[in-house]
Amino acid sequence: MPPMTRKTRIQPIEPVAEEDDNGYDRPSKSQLKREMHELQVLGQALVDLPKDALKRMPMPESLGDAVREARRITDHEGKRRQLQYVGRVMRSLTDDETAALRTALDAQRGVNKAATARLHWIERTREQLLASDDALTEFLRQHPDADIQEGRTLIRNARKEAQQGKPPRYFRELFQWIKAAGGASDSDDEAADDAGDDHDDEA
């Protein structure tokens, strides 16, 4: 009977992380690609910001110049190349600088969302006030400091100008009256401008 031979089980080879000259693990290519894409998206968000909001972003001068140039370019291919350059500039930022930008952008989005919701509320309230006298009673109950006489006058004149097809002067003034009665501040107006929702100019 021939002697039994012991089979050797071949163990799978574990991938070895790349190390740099100092012995630290290098990030994988997929990780680098993902980080580059995230920075590109962040750069695009900066380019898309309203002008006033962009001024409040904590950017180094080199990034600010690159972003403003991207905003200026209208040619599709030229803008695409400039956005790539914005991404390259962003890769030179420190982790703290990138984190500060993300925080500022998140705050800006929150302000815009709140401002847009508030403007929509003002518009809905204006529609209700013009449609029903009962709506004014309810509005005054919720906002007792509002000027009752001014509100009634604006509503009456806004209805009349709509019937006569006149320019919406009182319609717009009613918007401002509702906004003031609701306690809108200057910061609300600024946020509304940033959001691009200049609703009180509509017809």
Curated annotation (Swiss-Prot):
Q: Region Disordered: list its residue ranges.
A: 1-31, 182-203
Subcellular locations according to the entry: Cytoplasm
Q: Which GO terms fall under biological process for this protein?
A: assembly of large subunit precursor of preribosome
A GO cellular component term found in this entry reads:
cytosol
Report the principal subcellular site.
cytoplasm
**Is rRNA-binding included in the keywords of this UniProt record?**
yes
UniProt keyword terms in alphabetical order: Cytoplasm, Ribosome biogenesis, RNA-binding, rRNA-binding
Kindly give the Pfam families that the UniProt entry links to this protein.
DarP
Report a single Gene Ontology molecular function.
ribosome binding
* Gene3D superfamilies for the chain: PSPTO4464-like domains
Spell out the Acidic residues composition-biased ranges. 186-203
Which SUPFAM superfamilies does the UniProt record give? PSPTO4464-like
Give the matching InterPro entries: DarP, DarP_sf
- Matching PANTHER family: UPF0307 PROTEIN YJGA
Q: Which HAMAP family match?
A: DarP
Query: What does it do?
Result: Member of a network of 50S ribosomal subunit biogenesis factors which assembles along the 30S-50S interface, preventing incorrect 23S rRNA structures from forming. Promotes peptidyl transferase center (PTC) maturation.
* Name of this chain's protein: Dual-action ribosomal maturation protein DarP
The species is Burkholderia cenocepacia (strain HI2424)
Gene behind this protein: darP
